[in-house]
Structure formats: C-alpha cells, structure tokens
C-alpha cells in the first residue's frame, strides 16, 4: 500500500518525499479455519464529542467472508461495545447472517476478552498517538483480530490480535 494511488497522492498533498517512507512487513501465523475474524476501532466513530465512549466492532464467523466489505448479501455482526459502562452493554447495528438466527458471532466471554484487549491497546498507544502524548481531538486504534482454537481443538477459541495501527479518525 506504500505505492497505491491514494497513499502517493496523500504524500504529495502533504509534501512528504516519496523516497523517505518505508514499508513495514508483518508476519504472523496462518489461520486456515478460525472461529471468528474481525476488525475493531477502540473509540466510537459515531461520537465525535466523546460523550458516548464505546468500541466499534465488525466480526464474522470463520474466515471465508470479508468482514468490513463482505460479498453482496453477506452481513457481519456490527456492534458498539460499551466496555467502560456498568454491565458493559452491547448494541448491535447488524447481525451476521452466517450464524444461526438469534445468535451472535462472539460469545459474551469472547466479547469481554476482546474488550480487555482493546482497552489495553487503546491505553498503551495513547502514549504515542493519543491524549497521553499531548494530542487533542478524537483518538482511536484500528485493530484486526481472530478467535481460533487451532492450538487446543475443542477448547474455547483464543483471541489473537493480528495488528493494531492508528485509526485515521472519523473518515478523515
């Protein structure tokens, strides 16, 4: 993505020398048959004022369907998880149609595990990108994750965080 049209244009707009950028390479294990695949934002993108803090999560069963932009007719669980509120309520925006009706992709326990990880990631990276670094305004991290039981088949799936990076912010 370093040389995609969009990133090239953005560097040009901001006057960044194209030869001064580097590309990072991330290598992680393969997840050929994960139980759940998702992306999350560690702040509520629908709440610019910060008055309704929540984690925004898109998650799909398995790994066959794209999560954020699935094929036509496929829906993911899309939700707001109010992790810091009493009883940690979850508001579903859409439900996956790849799981049985009236069920969710993640269990309550998995949602809580994800919330703990997202909270830790948000807090840790605040030192570089958020309020702890003196930055003001809306701050969030974009996190890719999986739940997989390959290391212990038949046991509850383990949460794997594939990557976390600064979220560009409310569509900007």
Model-derived regions: residue spans:
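Conserved mixed alpha/beta core segments that line enzyme active sites in large multi-domain catalysts
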Residues: 1-172
């Amino acid at each position: 993505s370093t040389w995609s049209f969009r990133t090239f244009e953005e560097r040009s707009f901001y006057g960044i020398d194209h030869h001064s950028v580097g590309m990072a390479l991330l290598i992680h294990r393969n997840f050929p048959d994960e139980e759940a695949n998702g992306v999350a934002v560690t702040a509520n993108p629908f709440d610019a004022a910060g008055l309704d803090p929540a984690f925004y999560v898109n998650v799909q069963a398995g790994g066959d369907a794209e999560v954020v932009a699935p094929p036509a007719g496929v829906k993911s669980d899309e939700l707001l998880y109010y992790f810091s509120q009493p009883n940690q309520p979850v508001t579903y925006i859409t439900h996956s149609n790849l799981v049985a009706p009236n069920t969710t992709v993640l269990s309550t326990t998995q949602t809580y595990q994800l919330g703990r990880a997202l909270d830790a990631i948000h807090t840790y990276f605040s030192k570089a990108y958020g309020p702890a670094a003196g930055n003001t305004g809306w701050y969030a991290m974009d996190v890719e994750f999986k739940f997989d039981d390959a290391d212990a088949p038949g046991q509850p799936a383990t949460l794997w965080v594939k990557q976390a990076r600064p979220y560009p912010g409310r569509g900007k």
